[in-house]
């Protein structure tokens, strides 16, 4: 595990994402590179989602939650039936990274507000990118 990490942020079409999500991250085997991918959307929303992913990944690492645990839970959640439109796997009570996801969302909201964008507009941008 590296004490230093590099970030790489990319905006991709939803079809190029690992699964159906507006934001994702992967950590390399040495944990020296955090690759964050977001769906293509207006700049402030792209940066807000990227920030969310960076914060969530960092908090998970500090808590000892692996990227594989997050990915596996997200995959399981996405395969389940009956989730409402707009729900996210990280907000599910069963998510091993729920606390980290919710903290990342708080910071995402603060960023969106500081950038002068309404939260509902940001949510529409995210939904429109998928």
Sequence positions of predicted segments:
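Active-site recognition of the HExxH zinc-binding catalytic motif
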Residues: 48-60
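Metalloprotease/metallohydrolase-associated module, dominated by Zn2+-dependent proteases
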Residues: 1-47, 61-130
């Amino acid at each position: 595990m590296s004490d230093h990490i590099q970030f790489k942020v990319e905006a991709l079409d939803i079809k190029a994402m690992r699964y159906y999500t507006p934001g994702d991250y992967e950590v390399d085997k040495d944990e020296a590179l955090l690759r964050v991918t977001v769906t293509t959307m207006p700049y402030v929303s792209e940066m807000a989602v990227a920030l969310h992913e960076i914060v969530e990944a960092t908090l998970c690492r500090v808590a000892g939650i692996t990227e594989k645990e997050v990915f596996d839970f997200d995959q399981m959640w996405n395969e389940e039936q009956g989730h409402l439109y707009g729900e996210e796997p990280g907000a599910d009570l069963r998510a091993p990274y729920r606390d980290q996801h919710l903290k990342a969302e708080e910071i995402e909201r603060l960023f969106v507000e500081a950038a002068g964008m309404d939260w509902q507009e940001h949510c529409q941008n995210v939904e429109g990118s998928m």
